[in-house]
Amino acid sequence: MTSFYSALGLNEFFTLVRGNKYPLDLLNRNFALSLRGKAKISRHMILKRISILNYKNLEQVELAFSPKLNTFFGQNGMGKTNLLDAVYFLSFCKSAGNPIDSQNIRHDADFFVIQGFYEAADGTPEEIYCGMKRRQKKQFKRNKKEYTRLSDHIGFLPLVMVSPADSALINGGSDERRRFMDVVISQYDKEYLDALIRYNKALVQRNTLLKSETPVEEELFLVWEEMMAQAGEVVFRKREEFIREFIPIFQSFYSFISQDKEKVGLTYDSHARDASLLEVLKESRTRDQIMGFSLRGVHKDELNMLLGDFPIKREGSQGQNKTYLVALKLAQFDFLKRTGTTVPLLLLDDIFDKLDASRVEQI
């Protein structure tokens, strides 16, 4: 089962039966759920309709949505997850599963197009268009005007997705957990996203110098290290603030779903906490030159996921891991709802898999 909740939030949901080229049936049902806390919301953004051509295995889809809850049923391989991924693409300018845009074009096709038709709380329509042809640059437009920077779109349509791929947050490398922080913070804080982009650009340049087979003057290193330090301090500070505010929300969701059976936590480690980031980079330079890349910096930060006092990767059962991930994503939704100016869309893909009956009932 695949679902998404509209920008009206999780207060009361209603589904409408609709059809399309694919057997994705929508059920009529009422849902109610109360979330803790009140959001600081100035507007809603409802996805009214989506049009998809040649995206992954979806040849042609035209769907109109309920403004509340939409639930999709179908056999494996019919395209339910790809439909959610198309909605995700409209928010983040990329696929949740495959960042190589050309590989998302349907086999035997030369292009894909995704169009989303949204409506703000005041009735203002918003049209988001993404199109790509093979061997050409992706086009991303809002109301027929192309973005000069895709980063300007991030946060306009906030979104949270719960999917089986979330297991990488526990079992994958630290880059997966940094990406989690980046995705959340970037949706409500433009300063963070700009600093992250500047940091990564400077990191690429510094790594190029580190790989140089000829001697590089210190002044050249300092240009990029100073940029990394300046942007990195912003990234560190905002990640630290986010985690501090996020932990109690996450713990509250986990406690509710597990019925207080376990305690969980998050801790954040960063080289920027050890000393001035510029000094950290300078001190690490000789070793970095030997290795050919930057060993220290906020690109090596770690978000530790704990069950009790131990890493959940080592201690958690399948059910505990799934509970942890669902609580993490529902807390992300609630956090963005409280912090941002627009209620996020919430996409749920096989949310109940690996959970026992009592935890399913709590959700």
Predicted region positions:
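Conserved NTPase motor "head" modules and their coupling/switch loops across ABC/AAA+ ATPases, GTPases
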Residues: N30, K40-Q75, V216-L347, K354-Q362
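Conserved lysine of the Walker
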Residues: K80
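Nucleotide-state sensing region of NTPase/ATPase domains
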Residues: S91-E176, D182-Y188, Y192, I247-S252, ...
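Helix-to-loop junction immediately C-terminal to a conserved catalytic motif
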Residues: Y88
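Short hydrophobic targeting helices and cationic amphipathic motifs
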Residues: Y5-L8, F14, P23-L26, F31, ...
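An accessory alpha-helical subdomain
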Residues: A168-S258
